Amino acid sequence: MYIKRLELTNFKSFGGTTVIPLLPGFTVISGPNGSGKSNLLDALLFALGLAGSKGMRAERLPDLVNHSQTRRGHSVVETRVTVTFALDAETEWRVTRRLRVTKQGSYTSTYAVNDQPCTLNELHDQLQAFCIYPQGYNVVLQGDVTSMISMNAKARREIIDELAGVADFDRKIAQAREKLDTVKEREERFRIVERELIQQRDRLQRERLHAEKYQALRLELQEREQWLLVRQWQAHEEQKVQLQAQIQTLQQEQTQRQEQLQQKAQEMAAAAVTLEQLNRQVKALGEEEYLRLQATLADLHAQQRQCQRQQAANQQQQEQLAEQLQQGQAQYHRQQAQHRQLAEELAQQRGDRTPLMTAVANSQATLEALRQQVQELSTAAQTWFQEHSQRRQRIDALIHELEPSRTELSRLQERSQQLRQRQGELHQAATALEGQQLELQDALTTAAAAIKQQEQQLQTLAQQLATAQQQLSRTEETYQRLEREQRQKQRELDQLEARQQAVQETQGGFAARLILSADLPGVLGLVAQLGQVEPRYQLALEIAAGARLGNIVVADDSVAAAAIALLKREQAGRATFLPLNKMARPKPLSPIALAGCIDYALNLVTFEPQYAPIFAYVFGSTLVFESLEAAREYLGQYRMVTLEGELLEPSGAMTGGSQRRPNTLRFAQGVPPQESAEVQQVRDRLGELERLLDRLLQERTHQQGRVNALSQALSEAHQSHRDRQRQWEQLQQQQQQLNRQQAELERQQQYLSQELTAAETELTHLEARLPELEAELAAERLALNALEASPSHQQWQQVQAQLQAQEKIHASQVAALQAVDQALGDRHRQLEQLERDLKQTEQEIQRLCQAQREMRCQQQALDQTLGDLATQIERTQAALRELDSRLGHLKGDRDRHEYQLRQQQKNYQQLEWQYQKASETLTTLQAQLQELSTIEPPPLPQPLPEVPAELSLRDIQQQCQALEQRLRAMEPVNMLAIQEFEETQARLKELQEKLAVLAAERTEILLRIENFTTLRHQSFREAFDAINANFQTIFATLSDGDGYLQLESPEDPFAGGLNLVAHPKGKPVQRLASMSGGEKSLTALSFIFALQRYRPSPFYAFDEVDMFLDGANVERLAKMIQQQSQQAQFIVVSLRRPMIEAAQRTIGVTQARGQHTQVIGLDLTAYP
């Protein structure tokens, strides 16, 4: 793209319409001073809207109209400039600006692109599409180089800001900050309402807790009262039921006892009479004979049992012997049967052997006779044998010749068939190979398409990874920048807090201040600094804590030891330390309900849970009372403090009076003191930074995971692409292999064709020769058959056949005889073994029979003994029965009746005593029941509540008294606080949800601002680095020296300016302000060229930028422009000879007689 044509109508010194054609490359405009050279560049600025009237050397836009037009007195005069760009060889793009000025001095200015009206902003948007920027340096006028030299460092840095697009980011940041201010304003309004609701909620919470506690106590008292009524009624009813049951039971028992006493008396009288009678009968009879007979009978019974056991054992042994004998006899019979069978088989085999021996002898004689006959016939047929042998040899020779031929014929036929079959196989293989080639070609096409698709996927993944890495880098840079700001703000806050801490009087004595200012790790603060109290209870709690408010709380005892060592070393006095790791855990405080008592002092202090052991140590079980009068009732029982500051000890000591504490330690109030606006501002910014860092850390983790995932996906895609590429290469190799196989198949087919032709030729020859050989062989066989048909030969053959048959018969007979002999030997050995077994079995049977006879004798003896014992037992039992019938019955009755009589007497006495005791108890119970019946029970609640079984009536009465005292102590109570607290809590929750949404929105906006800030820094840094590199290169070309751009504040470029540092050849390093005029111009031009190279445009226009340079520097500048003109169109206004000589063409400008500027063009390349 370049400027193809410039058309001016009544513009400044150009009267009428002047068309100036332009070409690509390097063009110089030259002419006398005041001829209107610079007006051409002003026309470009005017048409493209790149400068105002001041930039075009006019006070007002109407001054741009040619003066000859204004002097003619027309009501409206007009000037028009058209710039035509060549986009390519055929396409043009025109920009036209018209300025119409009225006689009154008013004017209108319009723009048109390709004859279509547009606004200036629309024109600039289209120009930017062609890399022509209003803030760029496409047109460098006479004053631009001078202004570059004279401008301050900040303005020079702002040039790079414009090129880097910093203004766009500033605009986005400003918009985000406006939205942030709106969000903050809403959040502040909500915070005010939140604080009011929190205060209201806290107040209502305390009142609600008090009301709920009062309500719970009241409900508990009502429940206990119901329990008391139920327990009283239950006790009354249970006592009545119990007495009635006892009375009824006793009455029934008394009736039964009376009946039993009468019955027992009658039974004892009858038993005494019977016992007396039995005693007289027993004395009349003797007992010694009875005892002797019993002993004899027992002895006989023992002998009988012993004999019976022996008899059972003998019987068992007899059964075993009988079984063994039966088994032996059965085995003996089986062995006898086997012996008879073997004897019969042996006799039969001996009978069969005799005929076999006779047959073998006869066969041997016949065989010898046949052998003699064969020998005689062989001598007579010698001549026949010779002729037969010759015929046989000839037949063999023909067969020897014919068989290889037949074999060869078969081989050739088979070879021909194989070759034809092989040809068919090769044809099929070639067909299959063509199919494989087609499939392989399809696979190659598919693989190539897949590779192309994977390459596109790789490109997409690489772009996504680059974008993700860029986002991660931006997030990381933002995170590091905010971290640096956080550290800076934290240091600033520490300094502010240190100054604020210096004016606070909450650090106790010198020792405490020294410890707190030493920054020892683990020092948590004074007791007074760790708790907050309400103003109402502050005096009482400070009096109760006393000097312990100045104790120093530390994390553990090692910190306390280090602090004590510091006090010793600095000689700063003494202090008490409370290490958290050694303080005893607080014990639960028992519920207290005393008149005038507010609560335990420990419960009135607000502190973090970790400091519970500290404040339990400070206050212990101290109680806070409303007044001294209420506390005096419990003097000596508790440690108490009143709201006015009186202290009552358990020992009875009382401390009180007036007190002034100008410098004592104080508890913190419920609301912390207001901080200064500066501290609050720093603290708010730290909070924002902390939220932003947390959010950035989350985003960095997420982005890092995305980068890792994309890297993994890209690596896998690369691996898949390599696999697919390898597969494609393998397919290509397979295709090459198939091509080689196809060539090999063609070669084999050609070879098989040759082999088949040769085999068929040889086969034809053999098929002609074989019939001749077969005919000759047939003739020889006929002659041999005729020879063999002679009578002598037939007789010899018959005898020979008989001999062979007889030899077979003889051999079979000899084998049969040998088998019979072998069987006879086996039978003899079996028979001998069986005879030995029979003998052993017979001996065993005899032994068992002997043992059986002995057992029968023993059994007979035992039977005799048992019979004798049975007779004796029978006689003894008869004697005992006789005595027993006379004595045993009477004696047993006597003993039994005597025992029964004693038991009856004992039972009667016991029953009589129980009867008397029960009568007394029954009288007492009847009196108690009469008394209970006269008492009426109180009304009971419905339904009846369940009372714990472990609680007695006295326990419930004590609980009711304690609950009544606690309720009286808690009055008055706001019972509406319960409902009001819930409503306030709901409103606060809804408001906090809105605040959470606003906080998230604010964090998002802050993060967006910080990201824009990071992009702003990155964009500036990229532009600065590129322009600095361009400046170094260009300055080295123009001045034979070196130079660079220097930021005044590299850490924060926007906080400082930009300096041009140059080192001309042969001179020390200098800043721009200390250079000469020519050096300044060269340095400024180097900077302008660096800016142009950073943001290249299709054309550049310079207006006498070489006016302050000497000849040598003009030559360098001209050479630089000549080199740059290869990439862009350069239009330079100059009067210097080196510049004109370096140009490709020159446009001459002069002032005509009619005061209009005229131009003429000259192509310098046509004049070498």
Curated annotation (Swiss-Prot):
The keyword Ligase does not apply. It is found in: Cytoplasm. Gene3D superfamilies: 1.20.1060.20, 3.30.70.1620, P-loop containing nucleotide triphosphate hydrolases (3.40.50.300). It comes from the Bacteria. Required for chromosome condensation and partitioning. PANTHER family: STRUCTURAL MAINTENANCE OF CHROMOSOMES SMC FAMILY MEMBER. Homodimer. This is Chromosome partition protein Smc. It comes from Thermosynechococcus vestitus (strain NIES-2133 / IAM M-273 / BP-1).
